Every structure is written in structure tokens, then in C-alpha cells.
Swiss-Prot record:
Coiled coil: none annotated. It is an enzyme of class 7 (translocase). Disulfide bonds: none annotated. Keywords: Cell inner membrane, Cell membrane, Membrane, NAD, Quinone, Translocase, Transport, Ubiquinone. One of its GO terms (cellular component) is plasma membrane. It is a peripheral membrane protein. It catalyses: a quinone + NADH + 5 H(+)(in) = a quinol + NAD(+) + 4 H(+)(out). One of its GO terms (molecular function) is NADH:ubiquinone reductase (non-electrogenic) activity. InterPro entries: NADH_Q_OxRdtase_suD (IPR001135), NADH_UbQ_OxRdtase_49kDa_CS (IPR014029), NDH1_su_D/H (IPR022885), NiFe-Hase_large (IPR029014). It is found in: Cell inner membrane. The gene is nuoD1. This is NADH-quinone oxidoreductase subunit D 1. SUPFAM superfamilies: HydB/Nqo4-like.
């Protein structure tokens, strides 16, 4: 009788693993140190968001979007606001568009800073997260000064934004950009040439362009494989078509390329922010920040103190809400994690009939098995980090 030394393991990665980015549970089948199969178990953070939205008015649905990708909340609201605006035919004034773009780019930097620095932490570098969180703290303060909340803003409303930015805040955001670019250079210097960081990321989790399209990837995941696909450029929304920025693309499609793209995107976001700040202090210094269509946007508070009609109007908008013409629309934005889309079906009432949320992280997570096969166990956390997954949007 011959004896065989079998080294097949089934292990659980998560749900409380420090590298699992939330409540992810992966069931791994290993042959020694080599991963043979990865089975993601999702649903641990499922809150029934899409069903809850069907019972709320269009205005009451906005806070649900903050809680999807809670790392960059305003980018999610943006997609929903665009969908409602397309159904109602609402135009957003230029100052409102610039504020939206400014805060969308702040969200992109928030997300990329968290991802790049925690990616470094997953492979064992402790300094970058400390630097990254210092910058994220300043950005959270900008969120707070715009709308009063650090995380769940409910600031992008259909028709524009909730309130105008103070002049001083716009100036402070402008002053923040240069020191931030210095921090990005510091993180760059620490990681990009670092031998250990390279060994942990180069040629790990390689995706060819055909595979990226086939798996339904978007955002950094397809750009890392060599496609210059960015919704801000290919299907421009708001005022992105008037702004100058470059789209970085990779050629190897591995974790390291995706890291490099996120680093460049932070610099490009800062460049977009500078253009927005210049215009908000220049030609768009004064002006409305939300649509003047009184059927969607509530009257100003001062007006309500003077006019009975405004008070009635405000009461109607916040109790019954506005009725959206029947129809369906798909609105997508280039969120930090990829293409975040909202498919909104209206039946002509004050509540959505159906609101399907297309989360980029969901499509990326399903490819975990394909990406990790044949890699070492330690590479699973590197691949997971480069996918940039947040569980709020995967489980919704």
C-alpha cells in the first residue's frame, strides 16, 4: 500500500479578515500554498436597498446611494440624480455642474487614496495608510463644510446640489491641491520603486483585455488592461467635455499597472479640481446651483418666510414629492471603482417603480476565482486589493 501525502485544504478567508475589505467571505480550495478555487460568499451586508427605494419618493431615495460605496458617497448620488434629471428633462446650471464635478473628483481621490494605501498595507507597508488618511481627513472636512456631513452627504439632488459652496471653501480647496500632489509624490516614491511592493504586485492577477470585457469589468480594471475607456470622456456628462484631463492606461493588466493608474488618476483628478476651482472663482462665481424648475427644486428658505405659496410648495415637495413622467432610463457615471449605473423605471407616480443599481464591484468580485487560480495564498489579498471592492455596493 503506497502512502500519498495529500495537502489539499479548504479554508475560510474572512468574514472578519483584516484584508477582506468589509464583510467578504471567500472559501478557498488550496493545494499546499497554491489556490485552486475561490468561492466568494456575498450577502452579509444585504439591506434590500433596491426594494426599499420603491417605497420612497425620489427625494427620499437619495440617502440610500450614500450607503452603497461609502468610501466615495457623492459619486453614487450623482448617477441617481442624472437618471431623474433625464426622465424629467431638467437642466443643471453651470455652477451646479462645476460643484458636482469638483465633489465627484474629491470622491475619486478619497477612494483611490484609501485603495492605494490599504493595498500597501495588505502587502506589509505601514507608512502609506498613515499619510493617506491624513489627506482623506482634510477631504472629509471639505465634505462637511459643503453639506454638514462627513460621509452620508445627500448633497447631489435631482436638479443640482442642495446648497451653494461658501467662497472661502472654494479657495481652501484650491489651496489644498498643491500640498496634496506633494503627498502623492511621497507615496509614489515610497511604493513605486519599492522592490518588495513590486514583487507582490507585478504579474499578479493578470487580465487580458478580452477577458476584462467578457467579465464585465469597468473603470481601472479595463484601463489597466489597455482600453482607454472612461465614461467621463466616452459618454461625457455634466461639464466634463469642457475640462482637460488625460486617461491613463496600462499594458500588462496586472495589480501593479492598476496601482499605477490609480496614482496617475489622483493627479488627473487634482487637475480637474483646479479647473473647477478656477471657474467657480471666475466666470461661474455667481449663479444658481440648482435648476430653477420649481416643480423639482424646493423654494429657498427666505422665500418661504415671505410667501405662503412657497411654503405650500415646499410642504408638497417634501411630503408627496414630485411626479416623474413614465419611462425608463439608464444613467451611468465613472465612479472611482468603475461604471456605476442606475436603471430607473418610472410609472408616472412620485415613487420609482424599479431602481436597478449596477455596482462595478459586483462584476469585479465574480472574477476572483478566474484571477486567483494558480496563484499563492498570499496573492489573494493583493488581487482583492487591486479590484477595489467595497461591500456596501456589492451586497446593497
Amino acid at each position: 500500500m503506497t502512502e500519498h501525502n495529500v495537502r489539499n485544504f479548504n479554508i475560510n478567508f474572512g468574514p472578519q479578515h483584516p484584508a477582506a475589505h468589509g464583510v467578504l467571505r471567500l472559501v478557498l480550495e488550496l493545494d499546499g500554498e497554491i489556490v485552486e478555487r475561490v468561492d466568494p460568499h456575498i450577502g452579509l451586508l444585504h439591506r434590500g436597498t433596491e426594494k426599499l427605494i420603491e417605497a420612497k419618493t425620489y427625494l427620499q431615495a437619495i440617502p440610500y446611494f450614500d450607503r452603497l460605496d461609502y468610501v466615495a458617497p457623492m459619486n453614487q448620488e450623482h448617477a441617481f440624480a442624472l437618471a431623474v434629471e433625464r426622465l424629467t428633462g431638467t437642466q443643471v446650471p453651470i455652477r451646479g455642474q462645476l460643484i458636482r464635478v469638483l465633489y465627484s473628483e474629491i470622491g475619486r481621490i478619497l477612494s483611490h487614496l484609501l485603495n492605494v494605501t490599504t493595498q500597501a498595507m495588505d502587502v506589509g507597508a505601514l507608512t502609506p495608510p498613515l499619510w493617506g488618511f491624513e489627506e482623506r481627513e482634510k477631504l472629509m472636512v471639505f465634505y462637511e463644510r459643503a453639506c454638514g456631513a462627513r460621509m452620508h452627504a445627500a448633497y447631489f439632488r435631482p436638479g443640482g446640489v442642495h446648497q451653494d459652496l461658501p467662497h472661502q471653501l472654494v479657495e481652501d480647496i484650491g489651496k489644498w491641491i498643491d500640498p496634496f500632489l506633494k503627498t502623492v509624490d511621497d507615496i509614489d516614491e515610497l511604493l513605486t520603486g519599492n522592490r518588495i511592493f513590486k514583487q507582490r504586485n507585478v504579474d499578479i492577477g493578470v487580465v487580458s483585455l478580452e477577458d476584462a470585457w467578457a467579465w464585465g469589468f469597468s473603470g481601472v480594471m479595463v484601463r489597466g488592461s489597455g482600453a482607454a475607456w472612461d465614461l467621463r470622456r466616452s459618454q461625457p456628462y455634466e461639464c466634463y467635455s469642457d475640462l482637460e484631463f488625460d486617461i491613463p492606461i496600462g499594458k500588462n493588466g496586472d495589480c501593479f499597472d492598476r496601482y499605477l493608474i490609480r496614482m496617475i488618476e489622483m493627479r488627473e483628478s487634482a487637475r480637474i479640481m483646479r479647473q473647477c476651482v478656477d471657474r467657480l472663482l471666475g466666470d461661474a462665481k455667481v449663479g444658481p446651483v440648482s435648476s430653477l424648475d420649481g416643480k423639482i427644486v424646493p423654494p429657498k428658505r427666505g422665500e418661504m418666510k415671505r410667501s405662503m405659496e412657497a411654503l405650500i410648495h415646499h410642504f408638497k415637495l417634501y411630503t408627496e414629492g414630485y411626479h416623474v413622467p413614465a419611462g425608463d432610463v439608464y444613467a451611468a457615471v465613472e465612479a472611482p471603482k468603475g461604471e456605476f449605473g442606475v436603471y430607473l423605471v418610472s410609472d408616472g407616480t412620485n415613487k420609482p417603480y424599479r431602481c436597478k443599481i449596477r455596482a462595478p464591484g459586483y462584476a469585479h468580485l465574480q472574477a476572483m476565482d478566474f484571477l486567483c487560480r494558480g496563484h499563492q495564498l498570499a496573492d489573494v489579498s493583493a488581487v482583492l486589493g487591486s479590484l477595489d471592492i467595497v461591500f456596501g455596493e456589492v451586497d446593497r
